[in-house]
Amino acid sequence: MLYNIPILTHLYEIRLRIIYLLYSIFLTCFCSYQYKEEIFYLLFIPLSKNFIYTDLIEAFITYIKLSIIVGIYLSYPIFLYQIWSFLIPGFFLYEKKLFRLLCLTSIFLYFLGSCIGYYLLFPIAFTFFLGFQKLGKDQLFTIELQAKIHEYLILNTKLIFSLSICFQLPVLILFLFKIYPKTYLWLIHKRRFIYLFFFILAAILSPPDILSQFILVIPLILFFEISLFCIKLIQKYNSFMEPIGFEPTASCLQSTRSTI
């Protein structure tokens, strides 16, 4: 049964969802701080260097930032769950299934991007940059890395979050197609420019060596093509269902919010 709900009720629910999310982030940050040394050890593994800090409170501030970053990073599934809980009453049955699939796919790709960065890009990037060291008696001068703990954390954070966001591309494309069906034709028409954008993005986010750039750009192109293939399947499904009176393209964005 559909009926209109006052806007204040929606605002109250949004406020409640935000509070739940903040509670989860705070709890995750607190737990992360209890295991700050173990988490930092995992971050240190790709570089395998000793670290220094040059400010009296730098190590403490770095631990605090680490806890906040981990709390935000691990709260992404909870963030999606809160969005799901708010939107689900206004969804049709097939939209519930589609949105559930998009959420699960988004979470999987979110952590997949981090794993690719940690296990593939980080070793390649650090090996490249460590190659600028000048060690040994046969060198004209000596250059040795003395990594600062805070700068290393910020660098890792930027890389991990950048990759996690980039890997949301399929979810973004499918969502845009749901809102604006002509997105598919536009993506097909602009495919060459999108590929060029992927290579530019890979050059910005990854080290300048070709291997690391291809490690980043190949998944982006693969996800892009898979997204287009999925859209094509959805279009065929819609064209099959429309003759029998079913309107699969109807959107909850144009409907009235309901209760279950």
Curated annotation (Swiss-Prot):
Cell compartment(s), UniProt: Mitochondrion membrane
InterPro entries associated with the record: Sec-indep_translocase_CS, TatC
GO MF annotation: an example: proton motive force dependent protein transmembrane transporter activity
Membrane topology: Multi-pass membrane protein
Top-level taxon of the source organism: Eukaryota
Gene Ontology annotations of biological process type: intracellular protein transmembrane transport; protein transport by the Tat complex
Transmembrane segments: 39-59, 68-88, 111-131, 159-179, 193-213, 214-234
Swiss-Prot/TrEMBL keywords: Membrane, Mitochondrion, Transmembrane, Transmembrane helix
GO cellular component assignments: mitochondrial membrane; TAT protein transport complex
Coiled coil: none
Pfam (any one): TatC
Recorded family membership: Belongs to the TatC family.
Record's protein name: Uncharacterized tatC-like protein ymf16
Naturally occurring in which organism (per UniProt): Reclinomonas americana
